[in-house]
């Protein structure tokens, strides 16, 4: 069974064949958790795809919000991406060093959030690219600024107030994509000061399950994604909101669902960094 929206995911071969096309822009979106010991900017400077610019989710954010990498205003997003040479008419290809593409999926979602649908994730990311012996560089490009028209689609994002209200209304199903131990409250959170557990009524589908570890962590097939959703008790006919630790890996699940035709998935941007960091939110363990 093919993907319903295959244009959202491109292969390393496709990128190798099209990376020199005048409308294609490669975007390195690498991000690591605070306790990883590495940073995206450092890894980008070491090696990246030829011509790729670096999109830092800790820079393209709402600087006034204490929560990690919350979405910026449309004006800030437009200002940041135009300086990266990303604009109207570009076919934007996102990838990361992480394997799987969760950080790339966050940037994919952000571009769609701000009205740019011609965007895709390179399946398998840099690890797959390197495993195939494809070229990388440490040269930093100097992009020419382009115009980017940003129009935010507010239906694609949820606030904590909306999630709190939803606990009673149950209008939407919340899919928590953190690892099972974190969901159950038996494993610690990577950020200090977070309570453990999950939101009442949330479903758990760990985002890592959506990747194939034996194939450089490429996205699983449409059949496999549907089977995983069914196993988790997720009803694809219901309105869905994905949540994670800080709004990054939630976007990988949104990408997976988008690929199989579920296009209206929203992201709880604050995710567990917000929910687990407060004392007035209900938690189940």
Question: Which residues does each PLM region occupy?
Answer:
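Cytosolic catalytic domains that perform sulfur/thiol-centered chemistry
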Residues: 1-285
């Amino acid at each position: 069974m093919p993907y319903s929206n295959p244009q959202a995911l491109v292969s390393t071969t496709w990128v190798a064949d099209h990376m020199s096309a005048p409308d294609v822009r490669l975007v390195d979106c690498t991000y690591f958790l605070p306790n990883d010991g590495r940073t995206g900017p450092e890894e980008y400077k070491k090696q990246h795809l030829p011509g790729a610019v670096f999109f830092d989710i800790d820079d393209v954010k709402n600087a006034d919000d204490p929560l990690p990498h919350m979405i910026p205003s449309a004006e800030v997003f437009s200002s940041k991406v135009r300086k990266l040479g990303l604009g109207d008419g570009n076919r934007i290809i996102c990838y990361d060093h992480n394997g799987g593409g969760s950080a790339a999926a966050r940037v994919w979602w952000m571009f769609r959030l701000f009205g740019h649908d011609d965007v895709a994730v390179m399946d398998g990311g840099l690890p797959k690219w390197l495993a195939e012996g494809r070229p990388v560089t440490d040269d930093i490009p100097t992009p020419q600024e382009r115009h980017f028209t940003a129009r935010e689609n507010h239906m694609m994002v949820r606030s904590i107030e909306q999630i709190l209200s939803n606990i009673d209304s149950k209008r939407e199903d919340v899919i928590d994509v953190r690892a099972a131990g974190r969901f159950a409250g038996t494993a610690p959170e990577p950020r200090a000061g977070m309570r453990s557990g999950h939101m009442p009524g949330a479903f758990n589908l760990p985002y890592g399950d959506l990747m194939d570890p034996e194939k450089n962590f490429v996205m699983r097939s449409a059949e496999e994604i549907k089977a995983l959703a069914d196993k988790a008790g997720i009803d694809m006919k219901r309105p869905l909101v994905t949540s994670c630790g800080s709004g990054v890996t939630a976007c990988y699940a949104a990408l997976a669902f988008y690929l199989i035709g579920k296009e209206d998935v929203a992201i709880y941007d604050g995710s567990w960094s917000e929910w687990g960091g407060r004392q007035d939110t209900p938690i189940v363990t």
